[in-house]
């Protein structure tokens, strides 16, 4: 029964995404210098440079063409062990805006994990929009 529900959710997601241009992953990882949970929308190069400096001050920011794209991202914040991740799984045009869908995963209870601080994040480029951007956390299929 759970498999049927999961398959239905995937099918619905695919149907809702039909006609929406794909997202492009700019960077994803577990070692951001942004150690608080936050979602971001970046529409110009000045904002991008500022965000990138907070996220990874020791590296140059990846190129983004803000005349046609914008960057959306999710920072999970500081977590106590390895095994935490965040992934932007898609986006939907929603009237005058965009809904960005993301999934967080965490280690299973009792799992053996490296005892290191992590700060998972995912930054993606999507076609530029002028409306409001909202973020929706979706359930893991695990």
Model-derived segments and spans:
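N-terminal secretory signal peptides that target proteins for export/translocation
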Residues: 1-2
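Bacterial N-terminal signal peptides
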Residues: 6-15
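Exposed, flexible binding/inhibitory loops of compact, secreted disulfide-stabilized domains
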Residues: 14-142
